[in-house]
Amino acid sequence: MFRVTSVLLVIVLLNLVVLTNACHMDCSKMTCCSGICCFYCGRPMCPGTRRALLQRLVGHQR
C-alpha cells in the first residue's frame, strides 16, 4: 500500500514541476492561454480560453 502511495506522490510532483516550468514561460505573456497557468500566475485569461473552460464546466455538470 505504501509503495502505491509513494508512486502516486512522485507522479504528482513531476507533473507539478513540468507545469511550473510551462507556466513560467506562459507568465511572461500579458495574457495566458492555458487555464491552469492563469490561476498559477494570476494572469488574465485569453477570451477563448475562458469560454472553453466554461463550456467544459457546463458540459461536466449535465
Swiss-Prot record:
Domain of life, per lineage: Eukaryota
GO cellular component, one term: extracellular region
Disulfide bonds: C23-C33, C27-C38, C32-C41, C37-C46
Expression across tissues: Expressed by the venom duct.
Propeptide residue span(s): 23-49
Compartment list: Secreted
Chief place where the protein resides: secreted
tRNA processing keyword on record: no
Residues making up the signal peptide according to the UniProt record: 1-22
Keywords recorded for this protein, A-Z: Disulfide bond, Neurotoxin, Secreted, Signal, Toxin
GO molecular function: toxin activity
Stated role: Probable neurotoxin.
Domain notes: The cysteine framework is XI (C-C-CC-CC-C-C).
Similarity comment: family membership: Belongs to the conotoxin I2 superfamily.
Protein name as catalogued: Conotoxin Im11.9
Species of the source: Conus imperialis (Imperial cone)
